[in-house]
Each structure stands twice: as C-alpha cells, then as structure tokens.
Amino acid sequence: MFDLTGKHVCYVADCGGIALETSKVLMTKNIAKLAILQSTENPQAIAQLQSIKPSTQIFFWTYDVTMAREDMKKYFDEVMVQMDYIDVLINGATLCDENNIDATINTNLTGMMNTVATVLPYMDRKMGGTGGLIVNVTSVIGLDPSPVFCAYSASKFGVIGFTRSLADPLYYSQNGVAVMAVCCGPTRVFVDRELKAFLEYGQSFADRLRRAPCQSTSVCGQNIVNAIERSENGQIWIADKGGLELVKLHWYWHMADQFVHYMQSNDEEDQD
C-alpha cells in the first residue's frame, strides 16, 4: 500500500476531465502539496480543488510537455523551489489526433519520457531525493491494438514499454523510485470529442464510439487514486467500466532471463 498522507504530488496534465477528477480525490487524501502543470490556466478548477482541502498547498505552472529537455530542467528547478521535493509524479498529458502523428507521439510519449528523465534526478535517493512513485496514466489501447486510432495506440504502447523498462530492479534498487501505469478504458471526456480515425475506413467506428457506453471521469479518477494506493513497482492497472484490474504481465522473449544473467555475470566480472 502507498500512503498519500503528507505527500508532495506533481501532476502533469490539463486540469480538466480525468486530471481534475483525479486531483479532487487526491485532495481528500491529506496530501501536503499539489503542483499542477498544464498547458492552459484554469483558475476555476484550482479554486474548486482548494476548497476541498484548504490546508493543502496548491501550485500552478503553465507547462508545455513537448518543450525541449534542457528547458524542462530550468522549469523544474523553479518548481522545486516551491515543492521542496516530489514524492509522486503523475503523467497524464494526452492527445488523440490521428491527423497529426508528430503531435500525438510528442505529447503522449516523447514529452512524458522527457518529463520523467528531467524529474527523476530530483527524486533519486542516491542524488539527494526521497524516492517515490511515478504514475503514467495511459490507455487500454496501449495494451491491445486499435485499428481506428493507430497513432494514439502506438504512443500508448510506448508508454507501457517505457514504464516496464524503467521499473526494472536495475533502477528501482538504486534510486528508490517505483514506476507504474494505469490504463484507462473509454471515458466520457475522451469520446465526447470529435474523433478522427487514422484511415478513412475506420471513421464509422470512430463516430460510433461517441455513442458507446463509457465510464465517467469521476469514477476513472477515483480508480486511478485507488491504483496508486494499491501499487507496487512495475504494476500495470486497468481502470475501466467502473472497476480496477491488475494486468498479468507476460514475457514473450524467452531468452530474456539468460540475457539478464549474462549481463549480471559480466558486471560481477568487471567488479573483480
């Protein structure tokens, strides 16, 4: 179990929809500080959050998840002045625009990876941090393919690969930073938008999705926090249809164990 009491939480996402509902739940968990980094200002949402728990300090910065990593470093140097340290980093910025592959990949995958690479040194126990937890909010079509939203699905598959790689004990045993992901199923805020398929053959399915039964953003937000509280390093959760399910991870490359053993034996030989 991960206790959120007294934690310093940094949430990278637009403060609307799933991010807002997740933040509302976080504010009921007696966290000490909440930093919200988003692309546009939303003072009404910030005020709504503050009313839930006046004693929790809320900070806001406008943030472009696609900025260069060197700019992120300068940015987070300023963020850390207010936050002191970060216990939990939540990455929730997302874009589904099949007509703009670059923007979709940069927002959903590259920007998230650059954010993690920038923030990790502040959290790393061996670099003066306190350890903690990184939560990547992604999609169920990062687990199974989508013939309609091909670029979006590819970016979300990347998030899962990055999460599982970074959660390896090779890193966790050193830096004390656990990494997990929550895959959201179809959620109202997503399907309410005008959705375009990657190819015109899939457009009828994209149009039909807008009328499909979907979970509410509030239920999804609650289950994201539930997953955080139940999390262990490397876990992948599905938050869909009002429920929460732990993904059973599978290794397809049967040489993986032998390869890792080989690499570890070489490390031991180098130390000798």
Curated annotation (Swiss-Prot):
One of its GO terms (cellular component) is cytoplasm. Substrate binds at residue 139. Transmembrane segments: none annotated. It comes from the Eukaryota. SUPFAM superfamilies: NAD(P)-binding Rossmann-fold domains. NAD(+) binds at residues 11-34. The active site is at 152 (proton acceptor). Keywords: Oxidoreductase. Belongs to the short-chain dehydrogenases/reductases (SDR) family. This is Alcohol dehydrogenase-related 31 kDa protein. It comes from Drosophila melanogaster. The gene is Adhr.
